Amino acid sequence: MKSSIHVVLFFLLSLVASMALPRRQAQAPFAVVDFSGKAACHSILTSCRVDTDCCAGLKCGIFDEDALCVPQG
């Protein structure tokens, strides 16, 4: 009986202590990326929707029902 009271008290104290301590916040939860007004291009063998999604020298091609950036030519 005495040990169960100790367990309950320990649980309640740890619960109160965890609520009282402030949680540490990350300095920057989201990274801000600036592409100077232009979205980043997709590299070779990455998914795309149109040719303009792909980097220079690549085009958007269909392979096995997937659209991928592939070399032109």
From Swiss-Prot:
Signal peptide as annotated in the record: 1-20
Disulfide bond annotation, renumbered to this chain: C41-C55, C48-C60, C54-C69
Locations listed in the record: Secreted
Coiled coil stretches, renumbered: none
Keywords, alphabetical: Disulfide bond, Knottin, Secreted, Signal
Similarity field: Belongs to the UPF0499 family.
Domain remark from Swiss-Prot or TrEMBL: The presence of a 'disulfide through disulfide knot' structurally defines this protein as a knottin.
Protein name (record): UPF0499 protein CHGG_06021
Organism for this UniProt entry: Chaetomium globosum (strain ATCC 6205 / CBS 148.51 / DSM 1962 / NBRC 6347 / NRRL 1970)
